[in-house]
Amino acid sequence: MPLHMQQVHWMPSPPLAPDDGPIDRAHLARMTLGDHGLAREVLAMFAGQSAGVMDSLMGTPSNAADLAHTLKGSAMAIGAFRVADAAEWLESTLRSETEGAEALAALDDAVAEVRLAIDAILKRS
């Protein structure tokens, strides 16, 4: 029985380390049970919610720590861990009654980065 050689087309392997993007796509897929439509819906909801929360936080309302806590939970659900960390920093800063300007700026930057990533994901999907 002759042995036939077959050309195997090489495909690059996925990276060993996860992408360092602002959204952990594997986490998002787990949270949405692999449902691409649901993932898009959740991302769109987060984009809207985060914009509203950031607008509110810029006015330093009395419930700012609670708003930061809410944003932290939402960010964790979609895999936006930098936003979650920044929201946690702001929340703990506000609850300790110390100046939160630096933490708020970090959160604003993290949210802006995630919203850009969400826009790109929604446009390409």
Task: Please state what every model-predicted region is.
Residues A68, A75, A87-L90, L94:
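Hydrophobic helical segment of the DHp/HisKA dimerization and phosphotransfer domain
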Residues H9-M11, H36, G73:
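Short alpha-helical transmembrane interface motifs in multi-pass membrane proteins
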Residues G21-T70, A77, G100-L122:
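Long, amphipathic alpha-helical coiled-coil segments characteristic
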Residues W89, A120-S125:
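Long amphipathic alpha-helical segments
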Residues M1-D20:
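Intrinsically disordered or compositionally simple regulatory linkers and C-terminal tails
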